[in-house]
């Protein structure tokens, strides 16, 4: 399954969850408004003039409070869903087939060698053997050595031998860049 399909599936799931949450919060708002109207009717019966002011005041307060509660719940739900989409996307990229991983790692190494000719390459434990094999097979990477595994979901981190330059080509870095640039678009798609 491609990343786009996974993202679309997650978006659709997110959209459905938001609709469910919105329906639940509408019920809460209606209950709060009904409660406010009942209280307002009691006040109006005992003192009409004071009750008119109290009714207006209470209804406005309760409606505002209910709207704030609803907005807070919706925003929290949206944030949770966006976090789930992000995590699922990161997991989906890490779970792509081995052939894809090998091609992606080779492309990232070719990109890195343009900036750092000699250095240490770090990958996660799963990808380290693949990276070592790529480094040993292609002469263009003869200036690279394999470093200790690092805690990244995939991709590589290349560090110059003197430690002054480090390039982070981890999948998380790429996803973060895409995520930041596409967050508004994703939010619009999921929640409108």
From Swiss-Prot:
Keywords in alphabetical order: ATP synthesis, Cell membrane, Hydrogen ion transport, Ion transport, Membrane, Transport
Source domain of life: Archaea
Topology within the bilayer: Peripheral membrane protein
Pfam families: vATP-synt_E (PF01991)
Cell location: Cell membrane
Any one of the GO BP annotations: proton motive force-driven plasma membrane ATP synthesis
GO CC, alphabetical: plasma membrane; proton-transporting two-sector ATPase complex, catalytic domain
Gene3D superfamilies in alphabetical order: ATP synthase, E subunit, C-terminal (3.30.2320.30), F1F0 ATP synthase subunit B, membrane domain (1.20.5.620)
Entry keyword Nuclease: no
Broad class of where this protein is predominantly found: membrane
GO molecular function: ATP binding; proton-transporting ATP synthase activity, rotational mechanism; proton-transporting ATPase activity, rotational mechanism
Family under the similarity heading: Belongs to the V-ATPase E subunit family.
Assembly: Has multiple subunits with at least A(3), B(3), C, D, E, F, H, I and proteolipid K(x).
Function description: Component of the A-type ATP synthase that produces ATP from ADP in the presence of a proton gradient across the membrane.
Name listed for the protein in its UniProt record: A-type ATP synthase subunit E
Species in which this protein is naturally found: Methanoculleus marisnigri (strain ATCC 35101 / DSM 1498 / JR1)
């Amino acid at each position: 399954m491609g990343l786009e399909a996974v993202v679309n599936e997650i978006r659709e799931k997110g959209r459905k969850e938001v609709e469910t949450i919105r329906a639940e919060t509408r019920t809460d708002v209606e209950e709060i408004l009904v409660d406010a109207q009942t209280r307002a009717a009691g006040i109006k019966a005992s003192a009409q003039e004071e009750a008119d002011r109290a009714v207006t005041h209470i209804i406005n307060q309760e409606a505002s409070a209910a709207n704030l509660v609803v907005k807070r719940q919706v925003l929290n739900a949206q944030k949770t869903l966006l976090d789930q989409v992000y995590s699922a996307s990161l997991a989906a990229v890490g779970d792509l087939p081995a052939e894809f991983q090998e091609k992606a790692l080779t492309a990232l190494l070719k990109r890195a060698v343009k900036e750092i000719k000699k250095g240490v390459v770090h990958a996660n434990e799963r990808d380290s053997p693949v990276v070592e094999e790529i480094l040993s097979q292609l002469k263009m990477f003869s200036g690279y050595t394999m470093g200790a595994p690092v805690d990244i979901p995939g991709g590589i981190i290349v560090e110059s031998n003197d430690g002054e330059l480090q390039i982070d080509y981890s999948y998380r870095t790429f996803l973060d860049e895409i995520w930041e640039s596409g967050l508004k678009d994703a939010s619009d798609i999921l929640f409108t």
